[in-house]
Amino acid sequence: MSVSGGNFTEISKDEAKVADKNLSPNGQYLLMNKPVHVKDVAGKDIYKDLPKSDAYVYTSLDYRHWDKYNDGSYNHVFYKDTKTGAEIDITPGQPYYTPQAPFGGDEDYVWDPKGENIYYVSKKLAGTEYAVSTNTDIYKFNLADKKTENITEENKGYDTQPAFSKAGALAYLQMKTPGYEADKNDIIIFENGVKQNLTSQWDGTVNGFLWASNNKDIYFTAPVDGTQQIFKVDYPGKTRKMAVVEQLSQGQFDVTGIVAENNGQLIVTRTDMNHASEIFSFDLKSKTFKQLTQVNNEFYGKLDLPTVEKRMVTTKDGKQMLVWVILPPNFDKNKKYPTLLYAQGGPQSALSQFYSTRWNFQLMASEGYIIVAPNRRGMPGHGVEWNADISGDWGGKAMQDYLDAIDAISKEAYVDKDRLGAIGASFGGYSVFWLAGNHDGRFKTFIAHDGVFDTRAMYGTTEELFFVNHDMGGAYWDKNNATAQKSFKEFNPITYVDKWDTPIMIVQGGKDYRVPIEQGLGAFQAAQLKGIKSKLLYLPEENHWVLQPQNALVWQREFFSWLKETL
């Protein structure tokens, strides 16, 4: 499709190869990745005479991740000769992942412009060390001598997304704080043996980036004020000039990715709460967008869409908090509407103009509900301090932010204060469980999906231990750690179950190893034993998300059925 819009045309395989970043500059090799068996942990591998065994034997952590148990296989990068088909593993026999588990892709490896080296991301730690660390590094593998060099050894946090300019400068993303998965993400340039942080003085965090064709600028996306926008930072090179960050776009939408640059335009993907992702061009001179695809326009034309309003609410401690308020289609301010407080997960995930097929505000509003979606403490896009202000304080300021938001919006005459509900997943589910014991009668119903019910049990069963170590402050057995003890007692939802008295629906995935099954089952069991109206939606084959289409439809039907019944 032309960057000016128009019809689609199918491209050939040869044309696709030209655009394939995994093809070496001279066309001789193709980068690829696949799982390689490195360790024997399955019973049938340890005991060859027991081929039907489904047992596993572990002596350290990293025994499961996201929704899979470790079977002794690790993703490795290979370069394949395009003529002979020969494949060479660049990390043979090593128990390390590239791409990174569980979500990494080919952004984790790249050719240098000369095709002499492969740069790749790996966390070269195993077992328990792997589970408690975020220390991924970027490695350089030389094709000639087969030697590997760690080029980010000095940094003990995340190093990710290596990408070269055509002039040969390497850019990548870096988080400095060990074990902190939601730290400020900076753009680092490595050229001629010198590293330069381009965004250190900017009070934000980078999502993804693209080198400009001039080799001097980098375009990137970042959360800001409840949206995701396009930014530019210049690369000063050998000069002593300070790099300058400039916001290029603004509006009530999310720019979710930068695909390419072409003739003074960026090709991007963009979405908002009422519209699924489409492809746009962005003119770098006029700072304007042009929509190139209209995949769903036929459907939107048949719908009455909700209204999304941006509000600012003063918190109890005097801060200004952005709150999205989604009003039903054909909203009438003279009517009263049941209202839902939406609690975002993460906890350090942006509550921006996203469009979800599950937590879809358009569907909720179309069923006659107002949705209140606060950018509470812990969310990026409001400065590094606001983002960090939830770590070690899950049940503190963030929970008060939720109460401040719903109390402020409930003052509107069109909000039915006798019909308030609270809903959320992951940390949002934790928030619902915590509010269930601390809401002072505000809410008439709750829905918690894969939420943390017992922080102590969570510490003992979740797989990414670096997360709970940082966000909860440490281990529950460390009696001298005041932050940890607060997380496992005062900020633990299970502490307040004696105050539960409100109907609650609980959703739990059977293969959710991030917030494992005992969390949802424990909450449902407590509600049942207390005689509280409650429902469990159990999804045995789903992980932390609901991915199977018919399960997603069951989720939607049960969600709205519960609200209709209890609100």
Regions found by a protein language model. Name each.
Residues 35-83, 87-93, 121-139, 287-298, ...:
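Predominantly five- to eight-bladed beta-propeller fold
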Residues 336, 347-361, 376, 518-519:
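The serine-hydrolase catalytic nucleophile loop
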Residues 29-33, 117-121, 169-174, 217-221, ...:
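Residue position within the beta-strands of beta-propeller blades
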Residues 78-80, 294-334:
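N-terminal cap/lid segment of alpha/beta-hydrolase-fold proteins
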Residues 327, 335-345:
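Short beta-strand element of the alpha/beta-hydrolase
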Residues 360, 365, 373-567:
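Active-site-proximal cap/loop segments of hydrolase catalytic domains
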